[in-house]
Amino acid sequence: MPVIARVAVQAAPRAIDKVYDYLLPQDMAAQVGCRVLVPFGRGNRTSEGIILTRTPGEKMPGLKPLLSVLDRGPVLDGDGIALALWLRQRYFCTLFEAVKTILPAG
């Protein structure tokens, strides 16, 4: 059964800021809280993102696969993700901007 990763994407502007679904390839070990590279938009330009959740699901046509994982382990835990969601609502920023404020530098 395919695994769907819900990702906050850096390239998403405020007007369409939401969580995007991507197919997690079977040979890719990506955990919640890991930074990833994803194809985004009609031109499939590569953008950084962070996995917020993983769920088993049905294979949907048109669902793009993750390109690669940037981290060996999660850089953000459940509390960090919850904080990013709160920051997004409170300070009118994109979800990825909120995530970037809590990630360690480097």
State the predicted function of each range:
Residues M1-G106:
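Accessory, non-ATPase domains that flank or precede helicase/AAA+ motor cores in DNA-metabolism machines
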